[in-house]
Amino acid sequence: MLMPRRVKYRKQQRGRMKGKAKGGTLVQFGEWGLKALEPAWITAQQIEACRIAMMRVMKRAGKIWIRIFPDKPYTKKPAESRMGKGKGNVEGWVAVVKPGKILFEIAGVDEETAHEALRYAASKLPIATKVVPRHHIGGEAV
């Protein structure tokens, strides 16, 4: 599972997901990308499930880039515990995703396989996404 090696503070506040993604909105490494259309927290388990799903469709050919990283801890209090008594323990790690962010990129496979792999990965996520190509300007990839 993806998670930071060490963090300065063990627990974080929830924060809010206003607006669109500032960076990471273009396909920069692969030929096809999966773009988020809604804001959400994507867990480390969901990222791993997507990676395995894409590998299965691609039959280990090509290359996958994971453009998000779960660097935010989320906490949860035990079941049936009373309110108060401090913040709960860290339950897992999430990546904060805003609309427009590229989540995964794929290269080295044909268009049909890339679309199928990214669609399969999208089914593992709790948000709406779309498959986008790498932009080419004047014959050169951007």
From Swiss-Prot:
Gene Ontology biological process terms, A to Z: translation
Family under the similarity heading: Belongs to the universal ribosomal protein uL16 family.
PROSITE patterns according to UniProt: RIBOSOMAL_L16_1, RIBOSOMAL_L16_2
Record text on subunit structure and interactions: Part of the 50S ribosomal subunit.
Single GO MF annotation: tRNA binding
PANTHER family in the cross-refs: 50S/60S RIBOSOMAL PROTEIN L16, LARGE RIBOSOMAL SUBUNIT PROTEIN UL16M
Xref: SUPFAM superfamilies: Ribosomal protein L16p/L10e
Taxon lineage: Bacteria, Thermotogati, Thermotogota, Thermotogae, Thermotogales
Source species of the chain: Thermotoga neapolitana (strain ATCC 49049 / DSM 4359 / NBRC 107923 / NS-E)
Keywords of this entry: Ribonucleoprotein, Ribosomal protein, RNA-binding, rRNA-binding, tRNA-binding
Protein's name according to its UniProt entry: Large ribosomal subunit protein uL16
Pfam families: Ribosomal_L16
NCBIfam families given in the database record: rplP_bact
Alphabetical list of InterPro entries matching this protein: Ribosomal_uL16, Ribosomal_uL16_bact-type, Ribosomal_uL16_CS, Ribosomal_uL16_dom, Ribosomal_uL16_sf
